[in-house]
Swiss-Prot record:
Single Gene Ontology MF annotation: protein homodimerization activity
Entry protein name: Phosphate-specific transport system accessory protein PhoU homolog 2
NCBIfam families: phoU_full
Gene: phoU2
Native source organism of the sequence: Mycobacterium tuberculosis (strain ATCC 25618 / H37Rv)
Gene Ontology biological-process entries: dormancy process; intracellular phosphate ion homeostasis; negative regulation of phosphate metabolic process; negative regulation of phosphate transmembrane transport; phosphate ion transport; response to antibiotic
Length: 213
């Protein structure tokens, strides 16, 4: 009975890892759509989001079934409760990539971003994908040391977010209010994507150690 239980727990981790991978791919494609005003790619991200939503629902259901039927305690209870919380975090990562793609679609055929901030968003996209990949790795490996490193990787996103705001607040900004709103929203989407990846890492640490960093 316990063997079957631990197999189900392992399957749940694999499903969470798959969700992280899909969220990372979605953000990578959404960033390309944003930078290149690529409507086809934006539409692909939007249509593919259903995969993450389906996996999210299945993972959450699996976790609650384990919780209800197995009455886990101690480490097993931590693992399931953390998994339920991770489902929500990873689901939000996918939703944030979806938001980026929708802005790219809404502004098409124009570019949503002024050319002078493209470099910031190219780098924010790179960091976001890296964080998504790292989150996938620690969800599958349950490695608390690697999970702790993700919090450091997030510093790069925070720095980019701050620097971008100095550009927006500069008197030399000449792209108008609508562009400033888009840039602000998009920057926030990338920052929140990174924050949720960090939350996933924190929950992996809690699963492994019982201490919440």
């Amino acid at each position: 009975m316990r063997t079957a239980y631990h197999e189900q727990l392992s399957e749940l981790s694999e499903r969470l890892g798959e969700m992280c991978g899909l969220a990372g791919i979605a953000m990578e494609r959404a960033t390309q759509a944003l930078l290149q005003a690529d409507l086809v790619l934006a539409e692909q991200v939007i249509s593919d989001h259903e995969k993450i939503a389906t996996l999210s629902a299945r993972a959450e259901e699996s976790a609650f079934v384990l919780l209800a039927l197995q009455a886990p305690v101690a480490g097993d209870l931590r693992a399931i409760v953390s998994a339920i919380q991770m489902v929500a975090d990873i689901d939000r990562m996918g939703a944030l990539a979806l938001h980026v793609a929708k802005i790219a679609r809404r502004r098409h055929p124009q570019h949503a971003l002024p050319e002078e901030v493209n470099g910031y968003f190219a780098e924010m996209g790179r960091v976001a994908v890296e964080l998504g990949n790292s989150a996938q790795e620690v969800v599958l490996s349950h490695d608390p040391e690697k999970a702790a490193q993700i919090r450091e990787e997030d510093d790069a996103m925070d720095d980019l977010h701050r620097h971008l705001f100095t550009v927006l607040m500069d008197r030399e900004w000449k792209h108008g209010v609508a562009a400033a709103v888009d840039v602000t929203l998009l920057s926030r989407f990338y920052e929140r994507f990174a924050d949720h990846a960090v939350e996933v890492a924190r929950r992996v640490i809690f699963q492994a150690t019982g201490a919440f960093p």
